Amino acid sequence: MIALLIGAGLALLFALVGTPLFIRLLVRKSYGQFIRDDGPTSHHTKRGTPTMGGTVVVFAVLLSYALTHLIMWMMNPRSPGPSASALLLLFLMVGMGLVGFLDDFIKISKQRSLGLDAKAKLVLQGAVGIIFAILALNFPNADGVTPASTQISLVRDIPWLNLAFGGTVLGAILFVLWSNLIVTAATNGVNLTDGLDGLAAGASVMVFGAYTLMGIWQSNQACGSPRQTGGGCYSVRDPLDLALLAAILSAALVGFLWWNTSPAKIFMGDTGSLAIGGAVAGFAILSRTELLLAFIGGLFVLITLSVIIQVGYFKITKGKRFFKMAPLQHHFELKGWAEVTVVVRFWILGGLFVAAGLGIFYAEWVVLL
């Protein structure tokens, strides 16, 4: 718990102090956001607002995680160092962040609201996701537990949903596909949510807060742990280090949100939304709660579904729209809701989804008692 408090405190400090410094740098270089012409007219006033703020979040997370382990080692040289699971998650976060950074850089350099084309972005996301998935099935600990499993999970691995039903090779291939589906869905879900001041950052704070609580619980109730109190146990590698990383991410986003809330002084850009989405997917996979992500990240799912419905309805009806505008948050803006109202109500909705996910997580354990 001491490590979690140290890590979260450092991340909050780095994000709070680092974001305004980064804003000044971006203003000097005239790195501002370009706004869609077909978006809500109220958004045109945001043109030129510094973007790529996710860079601060990523660096705050990396620095806080490294310093926390250094401090813990100085306090106790026998304390465990960085874990394979956390390093894999950081790889996924940074990799997706780099894809987003490239997208943001193209927007700024070419002075347009569109960066990488959809195919190029998916290819780059897929490449990062494939490397992550392959590595996640390796690096077993002393008990032979790898960071990820070929078994599909809700609260823990579901025995009868094993992707390796046809052998190890087929299982690995199917896992890579399954993992990439989760990664692509999560990254694009957060990316679509990042359309209003503070919306994606605030929603993500709650999501990572949930993974912090889940990681602590999985550590206490790990199979073979002397602290296990009965019921089901968890075969998750490095749950406490994942909880540390989730706490750091949540705190870093709180620090960033101070400057990103309406009226935003900086946007996270695709650099931030893709990095955060990658981290969300990483936690779902490495904590072995993939299916639970549909609840924990329910707001991201809902907003993604609104885009799918809009596009599908438009094609079927040959030009008609189901929503006034997609993603869903812009539909309510065009209905006359103030931006802050939309953001706060969507935060509430996101919080309810997170609460439902945590309820399922703990209810499953209680039932097994």
Swiss-Prot record:
The chain crosses the membrane at residues 2-22, 55-75, 86-106, 122-142, 158-178, 196-216, 239-259, 266-286, 291-311, 348-368. It is a multi-pass membrane protein. Its EC number is 2.7.8.13. It comes from the Bacteria. GO terms for cellular component: plasma membrane. It comes from Arthrobacter sp. (strain FB24). Its cofactor is Mg(2+). Catalyzes the initial step of the lipid cycle reactions in the biosynthesis of the cell wall peptidoglycan: transfers peptidoglycan precursor phospho-MurNAc-pentapeptide from UDP-MurNAc-pentapeptide onto the lipid carrier undecaprenyl phosphate, yielding undecaprenyl-pyrophosphoryl-MurNAc-pentapeptide, known as lipid I. The keyword Kinase does not apply. This is Phospho-N-acetylmuramoyl-pentapeptide-transferase. Keywords: Cell cycle, Cell division, Cell membrane, Cell shape, Cell wall biogenesis/degradation, Magnesium, Membrane, Metal-binding, Peptidoglycan synthesis, Transferase, Transmembrane, Transmembrane helix. Belongs to the glycosyltransferase 4 family. MraY subfamily. Pathway: Cell wall biogenesis; peptidoglycan biosynthesis. GO terms for biological process: cell division; cell wall organization; peptidoglycan biosynthetic process; regulation of cell shape. Its main location: membrane.
